[in-house]
């Protein structure tokens, strides 16, 4: 009996990838052991975050960094740092911004439900541009001049959501931001791998970039990384850490917080609810070390071999109602995936039955395009045969019943 079953929940198989709703990646033994070890000892949390800042900064090339409660919390704290700076009175006001300089410019095609992270800190998002290719109205997408045209006395910063095909280029946005002395915040939550992206955005001159620690890095699911300019990371720390201290004898590590630049300790800030435990910080740092040191290309080749087992089993059904395709990205650091396609059966119902009856959670992103996806992140030599066998049997039974 698993720990989940002991308390009334099922253990499932996450074939959806990094999705938070199904728990994200399974932790490696190395990461899990690090978290257990950390749980057995106390630590000054400011010192731990300062040490984490040093380690992460060496990897990312940033001035400083902070371990956050996921990428979304990182975005909230990025906005909070820009809005409040190192001013304790402004930190106390958030999410109210009395100066009204709280607008962040974002492309309409970068908008998503995750924008709430910025608004949570008191930011107002200002949409610009459009994607006429997507709407079928033309050949143009959001262009740099549209960002610049939206800048006014209330503009606090620019938001850039990074994907493989984000437009405009990050270089063009940084150029405009620097011209107007505005910070750029990059949402790169899911932009790993490739590992080069750990340094890419900082090298391009952005001020803050947020990554998920619980996706490809395979750290604790509720962890994240925010890295960038020290003045902003210092503000994040001041608004996140337990500030129940006497200023006279408070000696924060200078690489994280320069005491000489603040006049008083703020009260508990907007980030206090985004507390990150010592165990999560330790797990994230070990996971990051493993991520940058491992032979990721060999891992992707192994992932493809595991998908080929599932692919072979499904194809052995010899059914004309279903087809499969393994998709291999051009970047050798990215996961291959297996698409299960059908024009003839109800894939919505199939996916629902796989979840309900078998505890198999596939990626449903392509359901409206008539395919389900198997992501191999949580496949292993130990579970592949059982998963493949159950998936094959369930699809066979589903087709047999005429669904």
Task: Indicate where each model-derived feature is located.
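Conserved PLP-enzyme active-site core in the AAT-like
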Residues: 1-26, 53-67, 71-280, 284-292, ...
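Conserved C-terminal alpha-helix-loop-beta "cap" of PLP-dependent enzymes
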Residues: 3, 311-390
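A glycine-/small-polar-enriched, mobile loop at the entrance of the PLP active site in fold-type I
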Residues: 15-53
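Alpha-helical metal-binding/catalytic segments enriched in His/Glu/Asp
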Residues: 35, 225-226, 374
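Alpha-helix C-capping/helix-to-loop hinge sites
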Residues: 38-41, 291-294, 357
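Short glycine-centered, acidic/aromatic-flanked micro-motifs in structured strand/loop junctions
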Residues: 39, 160-162, 342, 376
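Flexible, glycine/charged-enriched surface loops at secondary-structure junctions
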Residues: 45-50, 64-65, 250, 294-303, ...
